[in-house]
Each structure stands twice: as C-alpha cells, then as structure tokens.
Amino acid sequence: MKKSAWLPAVIAPVVVAGAVAAPMIANAANDPIAGKNPSAAAVIASIAESSDAQYSGKLEQTSDLGLPELPTGSGGSSLEGDASDVLSLLTASHTARVYVDGPSKQRVQLTQQLAEQDLIRNGSDVWTWDSKERTATHVTLPKEAATPQDGATTPADIAKQAVDAITPSTTVSKPTEVRVAGHDAWQITLTPKASGTLVGTVRLAIDQQTGLPLRATVDAKGQDDPAVQVGFTSLSYGAPAARLFDFTPPTGAKVETKDLSDAGSHAKGDADHHRTDGSRAAGAEPTFTGKGWSTIAELPAGTVDQSSLGDEASGLLGQLTKSVDGGRAVQTSLVSVYLTDDGRVLAGAVPVSALVAAAK
C-alpha cells in the first residue's frame, strides 16, 4: 500500500462524523448568529454561509476506535504490512494544513517524517501528490450543472425540515457556547434515541460569525474519550495565496490521469461494477435496512472475493476479525463490519449481532 493511502484514512473519520450528522447539514443560509440565543435550526441554517468562505488553518484528527493491533516483524506478509499501515493511519493522530478559497479551490496538506502528501482542487482539476513515493494523480471532474432545489426555498423552511427529519430518532440540544481555535462557536449535541446504536452523541461546533463548522466529535457509548474528533486548532480567515492551488508534478514523477469530465463515463463505471467472474466490484451500490442511527448498509454477494484472499490473508483475517455465525466480523467502538461466507459485506454503527441478524 502506497503511503498516499493516508488520504482516505484521514478522511474516513470525517466521513463518519459527517454521515451520522448529515441530516443536520441542510442547504440553507442565514445571517451570522453571534450574540443571540439561537435555536438549533438557526445554527443549522447558518452553515450554508460558509460555502464561500476563504481561510487557512490547521486541522487535527484523532480516533479511538478500539481497533486491534497487528504484531509487526520482518516475517510479516505484504498484506499484513498493508493492514498495519491502515490501522496506524486510522488510530494515530494526524495534523493537516487546510487552505480553502470558496467551493472550488481547496488544498489539504499532510507533512510527516520528511514526506508530504497533498490533495489539491482548483476548479475541475484535482491533484494528489505523494512526495515519498513520487507519485501524482490528476483527475478532471465533470462540470456540474446548477440544479434548482424543489420544496423549501427559505432558510427557515430548510432548517425546519432538517430538524424535523432527525427528531424522530434524535434528541437535539439547545446550542451552547464554546470556543474553538480562537473563535466563538455554537455547539449542538445530537443524542440518538435508539438503544441499539454504538453512537453515544455527536457534537458539532459552528462558528458564530461565519457558520463554518469548526469541530465535529463522535462519542461512542461506554467510552470516555471521543471515538472520532476532527477540528481546527488554528484558523485564519482570508483568501490563501493563489499559488497554493496550482500544482505541477516534479520531473521524474509517476503521473496517473483520470478524466471524468465526460458524463458518458458513468455508464462505463456502472458496467465495471460487474466482473467477468460474476462478482461485484467495489463500486456496487449498497442496500439499506433499519432506520436512523441503527441503519445497516449491505453490499451484495460477491463483493468480497474470498478465493482471492488465499493463505496469505488467512492470518490477517484472523487477527483483524473474529469468527461469528456465517462469516467473520470486527467491531470497533463506533462501527461494526461483517463479512459473510457468501461474500456479502454488512456495516453499521451497531453491534456485530445486529449485522448477523440482518444478514439472515
């Protein structure tokens, strides 16, 4: 595994935090809410004000998911080494520099052990760069056409719909004042009503002046330290230097190019979901069962090609997972994953027992 894999590993906790709170992030707009006693809906509505924000900052991500540790040694297989890298990336703390100039210019920069990895977006051009491996990827994004939104048209309407969508399964707290990276923020706490989820609470801190989300914290039940926390430790508003969003691969770098600008490529992508051996590729879309915080995602049979794992991976699976009825599973403090004997994959913020029951 190339070290550029830090990118999904760092982003994964952000996705977790964002996914469980996604209903709260409505496409809304509002005036700054500093100096008031706002409702949760008003704080939610203010988030859209940050869509055009310009800022530079330092972002810190920490995870305490209770993932198993793999023994290291010279005799380990390459797959075991890859898994060790992934686990290290998921469990260790990471600090990244973030530069944002509106919705179409962003740069995330991670520097560690004299190496640098970057994700750079400038309009439709996206680059990733790994200085240690000297590899770069250039992706051309499709041009997005503006799509009018149906339904609610005012911030108040949209915010009300967002709150109404989650209140059946979630208790939403009254905003409280906190300070993050030197900025005053409103913090909202979301608490699942269901007892079957591993999620204890989700806390979102939102800048009082700009609506920019400054910190997201996901707490697991029965655990004192946050399972996932992503937040700014320093933040300065203002347009970053334009040169930060320009990138030219150094001489001798290995460059991979992917052009997604043609809308017709989606058809090819759908076809690629099916392999010639009948199994499903990673792009196969999941189905969902359950509701709210107890939702379970399932990828179909053939998603995991177990025959390709072979003897080399058997020891790896044994260390990462435990044997359960009908397959193997791993449960972290926040998320469980179940690999069935027929190659299905089930995952959710629920105990393994719930996944096993859903698979039957």
Model-derived features with residue positions:
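N-terminal export and membrane-targeting signals
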Residues: 1-14
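N-terminal mature ectodomain segment of secretory-pathway/periplasmic proteins
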Residues: 2-5, 21-135, 173, 187, ...
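Hydrophobic, proline/glycine-rich low-complexity stretches
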Residues: 14-21
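N-terminal low-complexity, Pro/Thr-rich disordered segments
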Residues: 32-49, 62-78, 147-164, 248-288, ...
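Gly/Pro-enriched, hydrophobic low-complexity segments
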Residues: 109, 177-252
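Acidic/charged, solvent-exposed loop-and-adjacent secondary-structure segments enriched in E/D, K/R, S/T
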Residues: 132-156
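A generic structural motif
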Residues: 142-143, 191, 220, 262, ...
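Accessory, solvent-exposed terminal regions and/or long lumenal/extracellular loops of proteins
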Residues: 244-344, 348-359
